[in-house]
Amino acid sequence: MDKLLIRGGRSLKGEVLISGAKNATLPELCACLLTSAPVTLTNVPRLQDVATMLKLIRNMGVAAERSDDGRVTVDASALSSPEAPYELVKTMRASVLALGPLLTRFGEATVSLPGGCAIGSRPVDQHIKGLTAMGAEIVVEHGYMIAKLPKGWTRLKGARIATDMVTVTGTENFLMAATLAEGVTILENAAQEPEITDLAEMLIKMGANIEGHGSSRIRIQGVESLHGCTHQVVADRIETGTFMCAVAATGGDVLLKHGRIDHLEAVVEKLRDAGATVARVEGGIRVQSQGRLKSQSFRTTEYPGFPTDMQAQFMALNCISHGTAVVTETIFENRFMHVNEMVRLGANIQIDSKVAVVEGVEKLSGATVMATDLRASASLVIAGLVADGETVVERIYHLDRGYDQMEAKLRGLGADIERIK
């Protein structure tokens, strides 16, 4: 099993190209199932989750071709199976995104309950609630969600959907299903993430009638059919934020090409308060940092607040900053699993339920640590970059699920990092 060997102590300098967003690519691949015409996505990252999704839709009879330049062309004209089996999706939470498109295209769908990171229950009940409001009949049995249209129905029907909580994948599922539903669908309490806006813009290119995306209230007027399009996947804001924290922690100077400050304002504000320089420049974002920064307390919330997917990486920065930081996780339970591994590197962190208190230390020391989930693995890489001596990060298959060639990009910025067996 692959590991990362990191020899810490080097500043990061240079330029790095930010890849397309995993959390936009996955729903957009599912959106390709809504039409029998070819759809081309560009700027598609090379990630394990993307490979899994491509394998899944190919298993349904879809033709999906990938080129070396980040282009994927999907032709779902021969879509033949409405099933997403457990064997294919057990490692990936995003499998639930196939439910809405398959139900819309086939009138039925059988989708395995999702896998992915073990960072909380992330229930599917909101998906079921929303699609049921549109008329779907759904049961959960033997580990599968089995959905169908009522007898005599040919389409879902528009509805007002108000979820009990903000749900990103739920909003995406309802958005895709509503494009071809009969009548108007109103999504209240909708998630506002840039990846949802990007999905909506792709669907509009395909002929959908959508208003209000990027706000908490989205209106979709169903249409008879969708057509193909070419769409560039938005840059990955979490990869952008991860590299920002790595540069800030190591005392570097890096241009993040294609990075967008407007998608990361809560993180940028905290980095500036900590003492880093973050500037919008032509072609991306420039991050500069010198010396030890000031610890920053923060609370994770839904977008546009501080993203839960950046909590672990910013905690790594807090570990070696001046002062004490209080980190409150409000989105997922079990999202402090990286803390014990950081403590192995010399960090001073105390946990009480959903709150972590981080007392900054002058230095970390290299050790062998184990990645427990996707963002935890990135945080351990950042900690390893600043630790004295050698750090080995095990179980980096988590990292490969969500970061496109991370060690190669870091090496290009001057880090001493290599993949080993």
From Swiss-Prot:
GO cellular component terms given for this protein: cytoplasm
Keyword ATP-binding: no
Keywords: Cell cycle, Cell division, Cell shape, Cell wall biogenesis/degradation, Cytoplasm, Peptidoglycan synthesis, Pyruvate, Transferase
Positions contributing to UDP-N-acetyl-alpha-D-glucosamine binding: 93, 122-126, 309, 331
Main EC class the enzyme belongs to: transferase
UniProt cross-references to InterPro entries, sorted A to Z: Enolpyruvate_Tfrase_dom, Enolpyruvate_Tfrase_sf, MurA_subfamily, RNA3'P_cycl/enolpyr_Trfase_a/b, UDP_GlcNAc_COvinyl_MurA
Residues recorded as bearing 2-(S-cysteinyl)pyruvic acid O-phosphothioketal in the entry: 117
Enzyme Commission identifier(s): 2.5.1.7
Keyword Cell cycle among record annotations: yes
Pathway linked to the protein: Cell wall biogenesis; peptidoglycan biosynthesis
Active site as annotated: 117 (proton donor)
Residues that hold phosphoenolpyruvate according to the record: 22-23
A Gene Ontology BP annotation from the UniProt entry: regulation of cell shape
Pfam families named among the record's database cross-references: EPSP_synthase (PF00275)
Single annotated GO MF: UDP-N-acetylglucosamine 1-carboxyvinyltransferase activity
Catalyzed reaction equations: phosphoenolpyruvate + UDP-N-acetyl-alpha-D-glucosamine = UDP-N-acetyl-3-O-(1-carboxyvinyl)-alpha-D-glucosamine + phosphate
Compartments it resides in: Cytoplasm
Function: Cell wall formation. Adds enolpyruvyl to UDP-N-acetylglucosamine.
Family according to the record: Belongs to the EPSP synthase family. MurA subfamily.
Protein name: UDP-N-acetylglucosamine 1-carboxyvinyltransferase
